[in-house]
Amino acid sequence: MRLLSLLTFSLFAVIGLAPAAQAKDKLTIYTYDSFVSEWGPGPKVKENFEKECDCEVNFVASADGVALLNRLKLEGSKTAADIVLGLDTNLTTEARASGFFAPSGIDQTNVKVPGNFKDDIFVPYDYGYFAVVYDSEKLPNPPKSLKELVEGDPAQKIVLQDPRTATPGLGMLLWMKSVYGDEAGAAWQKLQKRVLTVTPGWSEAYGLFTKGEAPMVLSYTTSPAYHMVVEKTDRYKALAYPEGNYLQIELAAQTTTGAKNPLAKKFLAFMTGPGFQDLIPETNWMFPAGKTSKPLPAAFDALPKPEKTLLIPPYEVAKNRRLWVNEWLAATSR
């Protein structure tokens, strides 16, 4: 009995002297909801980076890219975000002016996007072209130009996204402004007759489209690749318009809070390499912006290629965004 007590005491003494398991370092990433969905890149990105960093990644999702910036502005210096992933070039001037973002400090040699966008704060991770995607079984003769979309049959509906919360919605706003200029308000009034509804983010809009609520949706030239690869169908198609298609380059950046976390810079560097970039074509269904270890899926060869790329300089977007949103509101509320 005495021996048992001694052994028991010795066992507890050893346990007491053993170091406690250390909690893993954490990285908090604000992004949009489709990125972290079960079919998006988020789960695999988390898995790949956690293996590399021996850390814990926590995603916090918002409706879309514009909503991300709005949220960060509300939280200010108290934000929990180390990284914001899901902004685009249309928001960089405004995001920089907020003072909540810090230089990336990483080598961006492998990053290549149309127009050779480079920035010391905002790092591209993918890009694509906004397009009208349509259901060829319900709409055998889709609008072949932006003009035809604006002036076509009101019975043929399209689902759009809100430019105040969603980067695709903002992209559509800038697409219309690029083509119609001072006549954009009048063009919006005409197009409004074809709009079934305006959603807060891309996911809601595309969900309505695939459920058959409307034969058209604002999405990307790359969206049909998902249906070709996953669903083995070419039913859904995208259109390259003669007026041009508006370019989106998606970006990530570390916050000033995140700059104090060594994992933030490490993640941005990881984001430009194959562990992240290989996932983009078949989970985010966009073109990769960094180094990959394999070619694009064959389905991408069948996608329409815009002959003309439209992109308004970020400083001009920042200067006029509120004015153009108000123009859209006035035109579509009549």
From Swiss-Prot:
Source superkingdom: Bacteria
Gene3D superfamilies in the cross-refs: Periplasmic binding protein-like II
Residues passing through the membrane, by range: none
Alphabetized InterPro entries for the sequence: SBP (IPR006059), ThiB (IPR005967), ThiB-like (IPR005948)
Record GO cellular component, one term: outer membrane-bounded periplasmic space
UniProt binding sites for thiamine: D64, G65, A166, T167, W202, Y220, T221, T222, S223
GO annotation terms (biological process): thiamine transport
Keywords: Periplasm, Signal, Transport
Protein's cellular compartments: Periplasm
GO MF, one example: thiamine binding
Major localization listed first in the record, in broad terms: periplasm
Signal peptide: 1-23
Record family assignment: Belongs to the bacterial solute-binding protein 1 family.
Its job: Part of the ABC transporter complex ThiBPQ involved in thiamine import.
Oligomer and partners: The complex is composed of two ATP-binding proteins (ThiQ), two transmembrane proteins (ThiP) and a solute-binding protein (ThiB).
Name the UniProt record assigns to this protein: Thiamine-binding periplasmic protein
Gene: thiB
